[in-house]
Curated annotation (Swiss-Prot):
The gene is addA. The keyword DNA damage applies. At low magnesium concentrations there is no nuclease activity, but helicase activity is unaffected. Residues 508-798 form the UvrD-like helicase C-terminal domain. Heterodimer of AddA and AddB. This is ATP-dependent helicase/nuclease subunit A. Residues 9-481 form the UvrD-like helicase ATP-binding domain. GO terms for biological process: double-strand break repair via homologous recombination; recombinational repair. InterPro entries: AddA (IPR014152), DNA_helicase_UvrD-like_C (IPR014017), DNA_helicase_UvrD/REP (IPR000212), P-loop_NTPase (IPR027417), PDDEXK-like_dom_sf (IPR011604), PDDEXK_AddAB-type (IPR038726), Restrct_endonuc-II-like (IPR011335), UvrD-like_ATP-bd (IPR014016). An essential component of the DNA double-stranded break repair machinery, the heterodimer acts both as a highly processive, ATP-dependent DNA helicase and an ATP-dependent, dual-direction single-stranded exonuclease. Recognizes the B.subtilis Chi site (5'-AGCGG-3') which transforms the enzyme from a helicase which degrades both DNA strands to one with only 5' -> 3' exonuclease activity. This generates a double-stranded DNA with a protruding 3'-terminated single-stranded tail suitable for the initiation of homologous recombination (Chi fragment). It holds the Pfam family UvrD-helicase. Belongs to the helicase family. AddA subfamily. Keywords: ATP-binding, DNA damage, DNA repair, DNA-binding, Exonuclease, Helicase, Hydrolase, Isomerase, Nuclease, Nucleotide-binding. The keyword DNA-binding applies. It comes from Bacillus subtilis (strain 168).
Length: 1232
């Protein structure tokens, strides 16, 4: 039913239709800023206040995504009802609605489920006194249940269980398998029928050698991937072929490219036949490239064409590696062999689920997942045929609710959808379900939201609604200026499609201008691209600073410009411009690890900033000390917590005093040593007094803890130690006190759980830390203050800001999950590697590969939607900030797609994206503003789009100019003071005598620096030949005052070259040497080292995988792999006379102990060889390349290699046949 829109209505036609349409299920696709909440509220108000047949507000079920949204909606409805009451003061119906509003069903779906459980608990034998468990409490119960289950399974001793254990555990423990069981269980809970879903994915492995791979349920995704890769290879070769036709192009190579294309086309013709591809893909051979010589050929075009052809080769090699290293029969056999293992896993998960549920019922608790599943159980009943159908309870709600309205429908999951279908009445064409959402803003896949539910209805429903539901598009944006909308549309028309993005960004999806802003020429979207290449000749400070600091400096610079200009923002309520304030600005990040550094930089530049950090609480010193006190109370025989407490302000012992305690008893636990000190100590001794007071408190607290709650104990500790008062007097005291109060509050919350006691509380906290569930530092600053906001993109959803900075666009997407040995998918189930514990081999099965490809598309689609949410938060000005290693290379990479005539960029190019810049860059390369900069003409229809961009290419060292100017200004002030005869500022005025004393040096200093035990690296540094390329210089006295310089902790940031070298060495130490590793295998090695905490995240990101793999393709790499004996990281100690190392030493015959670690030794038929890896920068550092570098590098490292050789020959009694240095940069080998 449609009601005509009044002539004076301010609603758009689409909004009006969304407000008044009835009679069927309605899906409203509401774009960002389109006023969907206002439409939703207006629809409810009109139903409640209609003059004919009004309904009561409690006959509406309104489902929101958050409690805050529900509260806001109730508030808006109350305001509207109160206004209506002013117009109709005698209306009893309106007064009734105001009284009913508080108990109206306007809430999250979890809250509605809770209502259902409280009303119908008896239908499922649920204890009516149940409570909702804390997440950590639930996990602790689950851990206990899992431990008991595994103990029982081990006791049974069944072969099937041990087969499972052998495949998914390490030699040391079975925690990996326990984690797998819990993960599969929790994932299954996103399905309406978890057990049925678990049992269904066994069918993936229910095959025989006669099965057709093409008919298996996962093959659709294998087929799509093969087609995409082949088309991607073809696209590269077509681009290369086009280059041969260009002026100066490599025309002789045309025949090569045509032959290559013919082979690719042959594969494309058979891309649906896996068996045929198994025969054909390995047989593809790219012929030797024809020579291109002569001045008429452009070397740049030749290089570009060569790179494109090499790229196509790599794609085919990857295709072969992924799918065709094993025959179809071998693939099927692997699946069949894994089937019994998967069946055992499924039964183990089901057993765990039943035990876990029983344990929770015993304690009368439920979790959020139980809320939905118990509600679903209440709303369904089994009929005579054994089928599930709506129960009496469901029919009650169907009659109760006149309409069910769902906000943020794109974030609904399968269980929630099932519940909604059970409380609504009728099929889609006559239903009463009203859904509002925007699939382009579905960014909660990690919470198992299912955007395909929205998409399937959007494709099925029609604008007329005939025979099905009705869809209504709200695409007018009332939030942002035209420049913001144009920029967003320009990017997403090229990036978002059905395969990657999961929605076509067509005319219906485009944002249309709905807001009326006065003209402003300064609102174009700005891209700040920061080049922090390490091989630049910039200062060491520029090389040392991390990417985050450069971006923070760039942001701070732009904020200062906005505030000082000042930039004008439009106040819509007052209909006038005003000066921008800090509170008008937000900085958005994908995640918060960068937040502390950005806040530090902004504050250093005088910019107030606020972030609601969700981490850092447990690292706060005052919290760590308080937890150490509790650990000591629980068990004083814990040395580290006890030392922490003694060193803290609570006791106040210094390092020397801690040593005195340890000397009292060197072998006993530290607690015993402390008691011995007290027993033997001098009662007038200050340390004795400190320890005696603490010991008395400790005994009191231990006794107190036995009869009081943990929260009472914490408060007793605060009171006895006055620690709360102490931290209040420290810098940031208000924040520190708030942190201590949070710990007390957390203890009180813990006491409402099923657990009791101090030991359990400490385990409770440890569990939170293991899970990464940091409490976040307590809020001590109001969000209403005039400060710049810093938040995640997810936190910003639903908010708007006049000026938005989207930072960290060069950070890699988190694809870690794709590297696991197993994956879970709602549609396909469980994909795993084939694992043979006896043969110690494993490799991906086809279901695992299919899921990996499918999930990569889904992850990229999610990242596109996250980017869309970020861009659409801006009202007036948008800044995009990202960093790269070399912007010229980056531009060249982006230009590859510039000549495309279709709006949507090629699927394969988008599939390769690893960062937001990989999305944004190629799209911007086709815009006139960046296209001119890149030097590549784009298609006129695309480059002529009205979007306006301002692109800045910034070198990292340019961002340090402000600091340099500040230092120069300070120096000028000192010189001016001297000229005027005035005192030099105090921090630089030195008494001559003090200067003389501080500058005194010991006359025989060189003798003191020769230690009896030295490392090879120390000896090398002292004897090494210094050169202009080494990047080092001999130590010399500082000229002028050392206080003129910044302290080291402010200078040094990020990984040094040595630290990066160490990371590369770590990989070379652990990478398998049985065969030439692939890129993927090397990446897996790096990932494994990171998981084992042998590499930090920063080191992992610094490793150049291609440089690692390149080594194994060299002659020396081949020798190493084929060697009959090899060993790595070999430590040695060797005593040598000092004169052999330092010819001028005073004590020439004094023995020195030389220690070192040899990177690699290997033995071939010829003899023993010594190999050392080097991470020196070679390319671009020497005028004549490696030829010029060789003698310098040989001189630099000859001492080190001589000592290594001497050590091997003396210790192993074997002559070293040869020595070599391998330089990762450029893949150069230097024999010595």
């Amino acid at each position: 039913m449609n009601i005509p829109k009044p002539a004076d209505s301010t609603w758009t036609d689409d909004q009006w239709n969304a407000i008044v349409s009835t009679g069927q299920d309605i899906l409203v696709a509401a774009a960002a800023g389109s006023g969907k909440t206002a439409v939703l509220v207006e629809r409810m108000i009109r139903k409640i206040t209609a003059e004919e047949n009004p309904i009561d507000v409690d006959r509406l079920l309104v489902v929101t995504f958050t409690n805050a949204s529900a509260a806001e909606m109730k508030h808006r409805i109350a305001e509207a009802l109160e206004k209506e009451l002013v117009q109709r003061p005698g209306s009893l119906h309106i007064r009734r609605q105001l009284s009913l509003l508080n108990r109206a069903s306007i809430s999250t779906l979890h809250s509605f489920c809770l209502q259902v459980l409280k009303k119908y608990y008896y239908l499922i034998d649920l204890d009516p006194g149940f409570r909702i468990a804390d997440q950590t409490e639930g996990e602790l119960i689950g851990d206990e249940v899992l431990d008991e289950l595994f103990e029982d399974e081990y006791a049974k001793g069944e072969k099937a269980f041990f087969e499972l254990v052998d495949r998914y555990t390490t030699d040391r423990h079975d925690l990996d398998l326990q984690f797998l069981v819990k993960q599969v269980y929790e994932y299954s809970r996103s399905h309406p029928n978890p057990e049925a879903w678990l049992e269904s994915f066994v069918h993936l492995y229910d095959v025989s050698e006669k099965s057709a791979i093409e008919e298996l349920p996962f093959y659709q995704y294998v087929k799509e991937d093969i087609a995409m890769v082949l088309n991607g290879a073809k696209e590269k070769l077509l681009r290369a072929l086009e280059l041969t036709k260009a002026p100066g192009g490599p025309a002789p190579r045309a025949d090569n490219f045509l032959d290559d294309l013919a082979q690719i086309d042959e594969l494309i013709q058979h891309q649906d036949d896996f068996s045929e591809l198994y025969k054909r893909v390995p047989a593809v051979s790219f012929k030797r490239a024809k020579a291109v010589k002569g001045d008429e050929f452009d070397p740049a075009l030749l290089d570009e064409a060569t790179d494109l052809r090499n790229g196509a080769k790599k794609l085919l090699e990857k295709l072969k590696t992924d799918y065709f290293t094993r025959s179809p029969e071998q693939h099927l056999k692997s699946l069949a062999e894994m089937k019994p293992v998967i069946e055992t896993l499924v039964q183990l998960v089901i057993s765990y689920g039943k035990r876990f549920e029983a344990a929770k019922q015993e304690k009368s608790i439920i979790d959020f997942s139980d809320l939905e599943h118990y509600c679903l159980a209440i709303l369904t009943a089994e009929n005579d045929k054994g089928e599930r159908e709506p129960s009496e309870a469901a029919r009650f709600y169907q009659e109760q609710f006149h309409e069910v309205l769902v906000d943020e429908y794109q974030d609904t999951n399968l269980v929630q959808e099932s519940i909604l279908q059970l409380v609504t009445s009728g099929p889609e064409e006559t239903g009463n379900l009203f859904m509002v959402g925007d699939v382009k803003q579905s960014i909660y896949r990690f919470r198992l939201a299912e955007p395909l539910l929205f998409l399937s209805k959007y494709k099925r429903f029609t604008e007329s609604g005939e025979g099905t539901g009705r869809k209504i598009d709200l695409n007018k944006n009332f939030r942002s200026r035209a420049d913001i909308l144009d920029s967003t549309n320009f990017l997403f028309k090229q990036l978002m499609g059905g395969k990657i993005g999961e929605v076509d960004y067509d005319e219906q999806a485009e944002l249309k201008l709905g807001a009326a802003y006065p003209d402003n020429d300064e609102t174009e979207t700005e891209l700040l691209l920061i080049d922090n290449a390490e091989d630049t000749d910039a200062s060491e400070e520029a090389e040392e600073l991390e990417t985050v600091q450069f971006e923070a400096k760039a942001i701070a610079k732009e904020i200062r410009k906005l505030i000082s200009s000042p930039f004008k923002v439009y106040d819509g309520k007052k209909k006038t411009h005003r000066n921008i304030q800090y509170r008008d600005i937000v900085i958005l990040l994908r995640s918060m690890p960068w937040a502390p550094q950005i806040m530090e930089e902004l504050r250093a530049q005088g910019i107030p900033v606020y972030a609601n950090l969700t981490s850092g609480y447990f690292e706060a010193v005052e919290v760590a000390v308080a937890l150490s006190v509790l650990k000591v109370i629980d068990n004083p025989y814990q040395d580290i917590p006890l030392a922490s407490v003694l060193r803290s302000p609570i006791v106040g012992a210094d390092e020397n005093e801690l040593s005195l305690i340890r000397l009292e008893n060197k072998k006993a636990p530290y607690y015993e040593a402390m008691k011995d000190y007290l027993a033997a100590g001098d009662r007038s001794d200050e340390l004795y007094q400190k320890l005696n007071t603490f010991y008395g408190h400790l005994q009191k607290w231990r006794a107190f803890s036995k009869n009081h709650s943990v929260s009472e104990l914490i408060w007793e500790v605060y009171r006895d130690t006055k620690y709360m008062d102490y931290v209040g007097g420290m810098p940031g005291g208000k924040q520190r006190q708030a942190n201590l109060r949070v710990l007390y509050d957390r203890a009180r919350q813990y006491e409402s759980t099923a657990f009791r006691g101090l030991f359990r509380f400490l385990r409770f906290i440890e569990r939170m830390q293991e899970r990464g569930d940091d409490l976040g530092t307590a809020r001590a600053l109001s969000e209403q203050e005039d400060v710049v906001r810093l938040m995640t993109i997810h936190s910003s959803k639903g908010l708007e800001f006049p000026v938005v900075f989207v930072a960290g666009l060069g950070r890699n997407f988190n694809m870690m999950d794709l590297n696991k040995s197993y994956l879970l998918d709602k549609e396909l189930g469980f994909g795993t590697k084939y694992i043979h514990p006896q043969l110690r081999i494993s490799y991906p099965t086809l279901p695992l590969i299919a899921m990996k490809k499918k999930m990569r598309r889904e992850l990229l689609s999610e990242e596109l939607r996250v980017l869309y949410v970020a861009l659409t938060r801006a009202k007036e000005k948008l800044f995009l900030i990202g960093s790269c290693k070399d912007h010229q290379k980056q531009l060249a990479k982006w230009q590859a797609s510039a000549s495309q005539t279709d709006w949507l960029l090629p699927e394969f190019d988008r599939y390769q994206a690893r960062t937001y810049l990989d999305f944004i860059g190629p799209a911007l390369a086709r815009h006139r503003d960046l296209g001119d900069l890149a030097g590549v003409p784009a298609h006129a229809d695309i480059s002529g789009h009205p979007a306006r961009f301002a692109v800045q290419m910034i070198h990292s060292y340019d961002l340090l100019d402000d600091d340099l100017e500040e230092r120069m200004e300070e120096k000028s002030e000192r010189l001016e003071a001297i000229r005027r005869g005035e005192p030099v500022p105090g921090s630089f005025a030195f008494d001559e005598k003090a200067r003389e004393q501080l500058s005194w040096t010991y006359p025989h200093q060189e003798v003191t620096q020769i230690r009896t035990k030295q490392s090879v690296s120390e000896i090398k540094r002292k004897r090494e030949y210094e050169d202009e390329y080494s990047g080092r210089a001999p130590v010399k006295p500082a000229d002028g005052s050392i206080l003129y310089r910044r302290p080291a902790f402010m200078m040094k940031k990020g990984l040094t070259a040595a630290e990066k070298g160490t990371a590369m060495h770590t990989v070379m130490q652990h990478i398998p040497l049985s065969h030439v590793p692939s890129i993927e295998e090397a990446e897996q090695t790096v990932h494994r080292l990171y998981e084992k905490e042998l590499l930090t995240e920063e080191q992992k990101d610094a490793i150049d995988i291609e440089e690692i793999v390149q080594f194994f393709h060299t002659e020396i790499g081949g020798q190493l792999i084929g060697a009959k004996w090899k060993d790595r990281e070999i430590p040695f100690s060797l005593a040598l006379p000092a004169k052999e190392i330092y010819p001028d030493a005073h004590e020439a015959d004094e023995p020195l102990l030389v220690q070192g670690i040899i990177d690699c030794l290997y033995e071939t038929e010829d003899g023993l060889y010594l190999l050392d890896y080097k991470s020196d920068r070679i390319e671009g550092k020497f005028q004549h390349g490696f030829e010029g570098a060789a003698p310098i590098l040989k001189k630099r490292y000859e001492t080190q290699i001589q000592l290594y050789t001497k050590a091997v020959e003396q210790i192993a009694k074997t002559k070293v046949k040869g020595c070599a240095l391998y330089f990762f940069d450029g893949g150069h080998i230097l024999t010595l």
